[in-house]
A protein has these predicted regions:
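Classic N-terminal secretory signal peptides
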Residues: 1-21
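Mitochondrial intermembrane space
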Residues: 18-114
């Protein structure tokens, strides 16, 4: 009985913590997705090659993070929580996170217009 109580208490804490975490802009490791993009980039013998593609990808992701900082307050906590949860399952990308949040906000605004 005590173990059941402890498990229920732990679950309640985890449920309460998740929305709170969604209020902060996550620090995503974009290196894996950028390495993947760079590997698909131009042949190393071509001008720039994968090294340039990687650095441009990282720069682009940081620009998207800054866009997220500027727009963060326009998204609902549930939108943030859902979209951040999607980023934790695979290769994290601020570009994908911004896209998810913008689609969620657009859907909300369409529903409010009905």
């Amino acid at each position: 009985m005590r173990a059941l109580f402890i498990a229920a208490a732990a679950a309640a804490v985890l449920i309460a913590v998740r929305p709170a975490q969604a209020q902060a802009i996550p620090d995503l490791n974009v290196d894996p997705v950028c390495h993947g993009i760079a590997q698909q980039a131009a042949d190393p013998s071509e001008k720039g090659g994968p090294d340039l593609a990687f650095s441009k990808c990282v720069q682009s992701e940081q620009a998207m993070r800054q866009k997220l900082v500027n727009e963060w307050s326009t998204f609902l906590p549930t939108e943030k929580s859902n979209c951040i949860g999607e980023q934790m399952g695979g290769m994290a990308s601020y570009t994908d996170l911004v896209s998810c949040l913008e689609m969620a906000k657009d859907a909300r605004q369409l529903n409010q217009g009905k």
